[in-house]
A protein has these predicted regions:
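Metal-dependent phosphodiesterase/phospholipase catalytic core, i.e.
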Residues: 20-25, 34, 80-191, 213-234, ...
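Catalytic domains of carbohydrate-active enzymes, especially glycoside hydrolases
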Residues: 53-70, 209-218
Length: 294
């Protein structure tokens, strides 16, 4: 019954919402506290998931994302792909088909994960996450998103315990988020999702039944086309209102977009945070948007 009521309520909001919401990020979040997630480290600015990429993201004033996997001998590292085909284009086919999980740390640590993007980046390596935690401990104001690919959460919680308050665990798996919060209650979380408005409505209804427990931030993937946005403006306005009523930061990922006007339009709709492959463009668009209020 509660789920049906929520679906009806969100549906009504989507149908009737016309004007932009009265709530605007500029009135509630100082620009210095605006959270931008740099996808896979620094987006397109650097080879992904490297210490160098994370450094660029922090220099821009954003929060880098690390994708976590575990080597054959149990070392948690930052690496996104299921295999090495994209990152090691010059390697032999047998090597390209392998996964992080098939190699030991000694085998992983010598891989050049930067050369595929150009000789300027040659020599960059897969980072061990314990090294990243040491960097975070030295810079208490820095934060890091950690997206779980293949990791034992108990091991992750144990190894990162000194910097739990600087971590934001990101996952599309709600049960995993709840498990992590039991292990690391000081850590923030981000629940990300994409799909049609119907699919998103159903997922939000399910979270509503759980009172959005253990979720700090929620991210919706937004795709732009000639016909408008998917999901649409009215849906995003209604979703933002729902999330704010539960104290959850509303983040959008403008999928593969580097259009400053799209970032600014999403802020008009009540979006209060971004994930992006173009963190430099996003930060400039945000600065310009905040300056419009002066």
């Amino acid at each position: 019954m509660k789920e049906s009521a929520f679906l009806l309520g969100l549906s009504l909001c989507v149908v009737t919402a016309g004007d932009p919401p009265k709530w605007n990020v500029r009135d509630h979040i100082p620009i210095e506290q605006f959270t931008v997630q740099s996808h896979r480290g620094a987006g397109v600015l650097s080879p992904e998931n490297s210490i160098e990429a994370f450094g660029i993201a922090w220099q821009l004033g954003t929060v880098p994302e690390a994708d976590l996997r575990t080597t054959k001998d149990g070392v948690i590292v930052a690496f996104h792909d299921n295999d090495f085909k994209r990152i090691l284009p010059a390697a032999d086919p047998a090597m390209q088909s392998k996964r992080i999980e098939d190699l030991t740390w000694d085998e992983v640590r010598v891989l050049d994960i930067g050369a595929w993007k150009g000789q300027t980046f040659a020599g960059q390596r897969v980072p061990m996450m314990t090294d990243m935690y040491r960097i975070l401990a030295q810079h208490p104001k820095r934060r890091l998103y950690i997206d779980i690919k293949n990791v034992d959460l108990v091991q992750l919680a144990r190894e990162s315990r000194k910097v739990h308050n600087q971590l934001i665990l990101a996952s599309t798996d709600y049960d995993l988020i709840c498990e992590w919060k039991r292990l690391a209650p000081r850590s923030a979380t981000l629940h990300w999702m994409g799909g049609t408005e119907e699919q998103l409505t159903a997922r939000l209804a399910s979270l509503r039944k759980a009172n959005f427990a253990d979720i700090t931030q929620l991210q919706i993937h937004v795709r732009a086309a000639q016909g408008g946005l998917t999901p649409g403006d009215k849906f995003l306005i209604a979703a933002g209102e729902q999330l704010r009523s539960h104290g959850i930061l509303f983040q959008a990922l403008p999928w593969m977009s580097k259009d400053p006007k799209l970032f600014q339009h999403l802020m008009d709709l009540g979006v209060a945070s971004f994930a992006t492959d173009y963190p430099d463009i996003a930060m400039q668009a945000i600065r310009e948007y905040y300056n419009l209020k002066k």
